[in-house]
Amino acid sequence: GLFLAMGMSVDEILATSLDLNIPNFVKIRIGSFFNKFGFVDMAPIRKKLVEICGSDPSFSEIEMKIYISAFCMNTSETVYFSKDTHPDMKIIDAVCMSMAVPFIFACGKYNGETYVDGGMKEEYPLTPFFDKKPHEITCIKIKMNRMYQDDIETPKQFVETLVRSALSNRVTYETPIQVVEINVGDTNVFDFGMSYEEKIRLFNMGFTFLSA
């Protein structure tokens, strides 16, 4: 959503995604967990996003309206950031907070409050669109197979298993919207060293589902 809002084409987004060497800026650091409650520091990720976008705009500085959700730990509520509510906020700050899967990525701070991935509570970020007609809303859902973890012996295995369990117990809505479900099977979405071939396979899978 960020890249589309910044005016990038789908082809440009794909090329950028395939060229990214994620382990160069997504590094697991024990110290980050104790300081920011997540093993992966978001600062290098934020820097890379600014580099890709070519700028670091606020919500009010781009033409397209984009909503970015993050879950506020202080209030136990999902907050939707946009030019209507937070015009002076840097969009990439909101994106980093929305990426902050608990324990894996460092949590975000904004106006003294702590934020994590909005998807930890809601399966779909629908709240800003409740006034729309059902046929005007399309949600893309990534579905993973339930995985049995033979041995949980490392912090990484424990956190991944915990997060997968949390994602299977999120709030869902009965709103009759169009849902495109993309089943990625046993793919490990937390594999930061994913190969070029695996990225292509996932892209083709998503393209096939959306074209059906």
Model regions and ranges:
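Patatin-like phospholipase
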Residues: L2-A212
